[in-house]
């Protein structure tokens, strides 16, 4: 199914746009420029088993100011998310693969546009955290590639070929 977001008003806006189709069903939001070694089947299974309100994928990056980032407490709970921070509190970037229950719709309706004029998914997830909802973080094992640029696509191709060659 293809659902058109009329204007680029943020990922939380995209979630609201899809709400009539999604209804009350849990769902995966997988940004198309992400590539994960091994896929997400194990994470989907964990989401179904543990039933958090949201599951987010994180990975350490050298340039966290270019991503949404997450802070975790000593018990590995999400305490704060910030979209493209000028002064990143951690190096844990949101990968762009999320699993949500219908609670994300209410959270997306409750937030206001960011300084970029968008409804940020990080703000909607933060709303869940702030209201005591369970947001489960998972650190990516294996490689992750954001393929938003040509050089990244070529690197992703090399990573996949290396994986195939190792089999």
Stretch-by-stretch model annotation:
Residues 1-74, 100, 109:
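Conserved beta-loop-beta/alpha segment of the NTase-like Rossmann-fold superfamily
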Residues 6, 58-59, 82-85, 141:
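Residues at the C-termini of beta-strands that transition into short coil/loop
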Residues 62-63, 86-88, 143-145:
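Short, catalytically relevant binding-site loops at active-site mouths
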Residues 73-92:
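A short, charged helix-loop
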Residues 77, 100-167:
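Left-handed beta-helix
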Residues 87-99, 112:
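A short glycine-threonine-serine/GTX helix/turn-capping micro-motif
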